[in-house]
Amino acid sequence: MINTYTIILISFLLILMAIIYRHEEAKYKTKIKIKPGMEYKIREKKYKVPNIKMVGDGFLLREDFMIKIRRLYLMSYLFFKKKNILTWVSGGTLLGFIRHKTFMPWDDDIDMHTFIENKSYMFSEQFKDDLDKVGLECLIMEGLTEEKSHYKGGIRMRMKGYKNPVMDIFFVEKVGNEVKKIENWNTEGNEYNLKETWKNNILLPIKGEFIDGMTVNIPNKPEEMLTLQYGEDWNKVMYCSHPPHTLAFDLLDFIWH
């Protein structure tokens, strides 16, 4: 049976977590609640949230943070283009560029994919050195190596001098007539994400589209890919209930190196 002291301790921890949550959230988000059809500005350019149903509470990111997200994307795009490494937007970032024609104004990280053939380089010291030269850095979760992944295998990138925003890059592999996102790996093989498994022609060829003043690499059939991952209503309903990625990263910063 739980005693009074345990209840007090749990209550204190919950209050402390709530205070930390609000403090961290204020670094990156405004108190402006996202509403369908609302307008906002980034460097005097006007944007408009799609006028469709919204589920959950989303809050507008700070303008300076949205500028940093854009800068991180452009810096990484130019880096990988120079290295002749193909990457493309995925997940919530792809959803943003297709549905909003820009980054979603409440999504605080960038999601990317690349082929498994690039994994060795991205786990190398050379990769870290090359990023350093252009003002970027790579972070890898504790326990994650080129040979073994136990939780959401991938790398994380950010601009030097900033804890956030971050870019997560996950690996995919061609398997027969399909391309599969790799969830984890070990010496026995790869584990795949069933929701992110596509016929070759849905993903390939990757297309460079000019969206919101940027060249954005997207899948061949992005609408079909979004339907497979998010369901038939991805362009009819906006879901905003997930906790900020920035908060989790700030609190768990010690597990990345």
List each model region and its residues.
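Terminal signal-anchor or tail-anchor transmembrane helices
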Residues: 3-25
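Terminal accessory/targeting
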Residues: 11-14, 29-33, 237-239, 243
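Helical scaffold of the NTase/Pol beta-like nucleotidyltransferase catalytic core
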Residues: 29-90
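Conserved catalytic core of two-metal-ion nucleotidyltransferases
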Residues: 60-81, 128-229, 237-257
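Active-site nucleotide-donor binding segment shared across nucleotidyl transfer reactions
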Residues: 77-110, 117-120
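Structural signal for hydrophobic/aromatic residues that build the beta-strand cores
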Residues: 109-112, 213
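Conserved donor-nucleotide/metal-binding helix-loop-beta segment in metal-dependent transferases, i.e.
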Residues: 119-121, 125-131
